[in-house]
């Protein structure tokens, strides 16, 4: 690919998305978190086989919280206590949750090796208290500990989507219009749900042109 000919050029959805699958492929190389969403940067493969620069913003992530019931309590008791409080605090109409058995192998005392927790999916993007996290030491009448309250969006992405470092991703249902021109990349895409981003087994690694910038401070001898 002649990369110089692609600089400054914006590619359209029709040039990128496979008409048979409705998806496109991206080799992600870097990321950043912005306004409780995840921005992925990397190389996107066009329908003609070109590799172009791309930015994909992924919304809709949920933080996975695990509430440990007190002795003599069960997940249903925790649900009855905590769900209404979370809905009020974060301005949510509903919250998904379910009992889930988990193992624990770290240093905190009084944590069972294996037991049933209440798993709660708390959206990162909420109408209220969106930057307020749940502290691990939070306790209630029915629970004595909370895991996952400080998990960041990138950690949620790699764990929930099973992404093992830079790799090829198959991305569906991308919006190519809403973010057009938001970055200096050739393609800017918005994806509303992380479930539309799936890692795939493709060992071909795209070429990458890099530039290194060294910044040095120098004292002004005149001042």
Predicted regions and their residues:
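The two-metal-ion catalytic cores of nucleic-acid processing enzymes
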Residues: 1-223
């Amino acid at each position: 690919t002649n990369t110089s000919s692609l600089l400054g050029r914006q590619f359209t959805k029709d040039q990128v998305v496979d008409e048979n699958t409705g998806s496109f492929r991206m080799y992600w190389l870097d990321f950043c978190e912005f306004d409780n969403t995840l921005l992925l940067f990397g190389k996107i493969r066009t329908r003609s086989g070109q590799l172009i620069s791309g930015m994909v913003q992924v919304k809709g992530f949920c933080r996975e919280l695990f509430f440990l019931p007190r002795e003599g309590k069960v997940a249903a008791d925790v649900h009855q206590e905590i769900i209404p409080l979370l809905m009020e605090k974060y301005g949510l109409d509903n919250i998904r949750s379910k009992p889930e058995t988990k193992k624990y192998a770290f240093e905190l005392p009084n944590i069972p090796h294996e037991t049933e927790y209440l798993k709660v999916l708390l959206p990162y993007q909420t109408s209220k208290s969106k930057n307020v996290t749940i502290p691990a030491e939070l306790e209630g009448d029915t629970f004595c500990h909370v895991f996952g309250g400080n998990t960041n969006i990138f950690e949620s992405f790699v764990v929930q989507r099973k992404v093992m470092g830079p790799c090829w991703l198959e991305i569906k249902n991308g919006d190519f219009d809403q973010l057009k021109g938001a970055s200096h990349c050739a393609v800017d895409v918005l994806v509303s749900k992380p479930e539309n981003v799936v890692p795939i087994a493709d060992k071909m690694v795209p070429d990458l042109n890099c530039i290194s910038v060294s910044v040095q401070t120098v004292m002004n001898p005149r001042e």
